[in-house]
Each structure stands twice: as structure tokens, then as C-alpha cells.
Design a protein with these regions (language model features):
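N-terminal glycine-rich phosphate-binding loop and ensuing alpha1 helix
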Residues: 1-48
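Catalytic metal- and UDP-sugar-binding loop of GT-A-like glycosyltransferases, i.e.
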Residues: 104
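Conserved core of the sugar-phosphate nucleotidyltransferase
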Residues: 100, 109-196
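Conserved alpha/beta core of the MobA/IspD/sugar-nucleotide pyrophosphorylase nucleotidyltransferase superfamily
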Residues: 171-230
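Short phosphate-binding loop-to-helix
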Residues: 53-101, 111, 118
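Short active-site oxyanion
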Residues: 41-46, 129, 205-206
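Short, structured coil segments at secondary-structure junctions
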Residues: 41, 61-63, 149
């Protein structure tokens, strides 16, 4: 059995009502719901929310909303694992450690069926506990600086002063799109970003933080470019 859990709280601060704001003709949450449904991977596509309007929009997009998330798991400090664990409990899956659960973020407009399938394949073929989306970091933090109170600048890694950028190690960060694991891993003390995790590498052109208006507009431009290229 496989379940997709899309966590979508109603209290977005920087972009109010972000999770159901129109994006390319649909409420933004409808895009990851569509990707999950079209992948054919999941027995259930669940939206975990504390918000009645989000629940209604999610159902209209084809997702299930079998429970309402409590307020204590819907504030700025609620972490992903706690939200997924709550969903696992509500779905009565605590005693089924091999069930596979994919957490997909509600603004993951660039997630598609192929990326979700690649993540599942890596989870099945490896001995890892978590598989999640990653993207490259550019420019490299190995050439980064710190700033003192008097505005003096110091290299964070001065040993790299004379090195060319192309000679520095490649760096990656969380693309904040999806996270695959079994129920057993979600319920464990293992960290999502730990030594038993594997990445699905996504081109930066398909990654965009959406935490403010300029980022929202940038995501819309990227989305339009990708849609027109298909």
C-alpha cells in the first residue's frame, strides 16, 4: 500500500492563503494533487489540513480529506515528521511499518509523476530510510563570507581563496518538494536529512521557493516556460 500525504495548513503568513491561491489557472495545491493522482502510485492521496476551505478545494481536486489536523500541529513550529505521523495515526497505519508514504508539499508545482516514480524506485532499490528531492546550490557556499558588526568581511572558508569555483565540491540542498519513506521510518527517530537518506536530483530550473511575491511570480514564469516547452 502507498499513501501520499499533502500537508496544507491555513495559516500561511508571508503569502496569505498561499496553499489555495490561484496558480496557472488552478488553486496551487491542485497541481501536486494532480501529479500524485496521475502517477498511479498511490492507493490514497490525502490532504492534511486544519482549514475547511482548503479541505473543500482539495476534495474538488480529487484528494481525500478524511480528518482535520489539530491546531497544535498547524502552527509555524509544526515539523513535517510530526504532521506525517499524525496522518499515519489517523489512517490507522501505525502497525503497518512497510506501507510507503510520500509527503508532497502543497506548493510543489514542478513535481510530476516521473519524479515521484524515481523517488519510489530509489526507496525500493536501496537500503535507505528516506528519499527526498534535492537541487544544486549555486553559487557555492565554499566562497561565502561572514559580516561583522562593523561591516568587515571574512571568508567562511579562507582555504578556498585561490581555488576556482569549478574545482570546489558540488553542493546540494533540499528542493522542498517530496519525501518518500515507509511508515516505520516516519515513526522512527531517524532524521529526514541523515546518513540513511538518498536524493532525487532536480534541475534548478524546476525548483523555486515560494515564500514571497517575487518568488511566486518567478515560479509562475518558470511554470509557463516548462508548460510551453512540452
Amino acid at each position: 500500500m502507498r499513501v501520499a500525504v499533502i500537508p496544507a495548513r491555513g495559516g500561511s503568513k508571508r503569502i496569505p492563503r498561499k496553499n489555495i491561491r490561484p496558480f496557472a489557472g488552478k488553486p496551487i495545491i491542485a497541481w501536486p494533487i494532480k501529479a500524485a493522482l496521475s502517477s498511479g502510485l498511490f492507493d490514497k492521496v490525502i490532504v492534511s489540513t486544519d482549514d475547511a476551505e482548503i479541505a473543500e478545494v482539495a476534495r474538488e481536486a480529487g484528494a481525500l480529506v478524511p480528518f482535520i489536523r489539530p491546531k497544535n500541529l498547524s502552527d509555524d513550529f509544526a515539523d513535517t515528521k510530526s504532521v506525517v505521523r499524525h496522518a499515519i495515526s489517523e489512517l490507522k497505519l501505525e502497525t503497518e511499518p512497510e506501507v510507503q508514504v510520500c509527503c508532497i508539499y502543497p506548493t510543489s508545482v514542478f513535481v510530476d509523476a516521473q519524479l515521484l516514480k524515481e523517488g519510489l524506485e530509489k526507496l525500493n532499490e536501496s537500503k535507505c530510510s528516506f528519499v527526498f528531492s534535492v537541487t544544486s546550490v549555486d553559487p557555492s557556499v565554499y566562497r561565502a563570507f561572514t559580516k561583522a558588526a562593523d561591516d568587515r568581511i571574512t571568508m567562511l572558508f579562507p582555504e578556498n581563496y585561490a581555488k576556482r569555483t569549478q574545482d570546489l565540491p558540488s553542493l546540494y540542498c533540499d528542493a522542498a518538494q517530496f519525501y518518500w519513506a515507509t511508515v516505520g521510518a516516519w515513526q522512527s527517530d531517524l532524521r529526514i536529512f541523515g546518513p540513511k537518506s538518498i536524493g532525487v536530483f532536480i534541475d534548478p530550473s524546476r525548483v523555486q521557493d515560494i515564500d514571497n511575491e517575487p518568488q511566486w511570480l518567478a515560479a509562475e514564469r518558470k511554470f509557463q516556460e516548462i508548460s510551453q516547452s512540452k
